[in-house]
Curated annotation (Swiss-Prot):
Gene3D superfamilies assigned: 1.10.287.310
Protein name: Large ribosomal subunit protein uL29
Family: Belongs to the universal ribosomal protein uL29 family.
A single Gene Ontology CC term: cytosolic large ribosomal subunit
PANTHER family: 60S RIBOSOMAL PROTEIN L35/50S RIBOSOMAL PROTEIN L29, LARGE RIBOSOMAL SUBUNIT PROTEIN UL29C
Keyword field contains Ribosomal protein: yes
Any single GO BP term: translation
Organism lineage: Bacteria, Pseudomonadati, Pseudomonadota, Betaproteobacteria, Burkholderiales
CDD domains, A to Z: Ribosomal_L29_HIP
Length: 67
């Protein structure tokens, strides 16, 4: 998901997105552990997407607290 799309979501939407990405990352880690994952770069991109979503979530919470 693009950062502009993430910035348009509210706090609940961002929390849901983080949770969904974490579930996907867990599934990928299990596939890697059982040697079913062929494209291991998806682990890195998923981990970075989680970090991106968490960063925007924190920014949104701070921005709402300042208002």
């Amino acid at each position: 998901m693009n950062t502009t799309e993430l910035r348009q979501k509210d706090v609940d939407g961002l929390k849901a997105e983080v949770k969904e990405l974490q579930k996907a990352h867990f599934g990928l880690r299990m596939q890697k552990a059982t040697q079913q994952l062929t494209n291991t770069s998806t682990l890195r991109s998923t981990r970075r997407a989680i970090a991106r979503a968490k960063t925007i979530l924190a920014e949104t919470i701070v921005k709402q607290g300042a208002k």
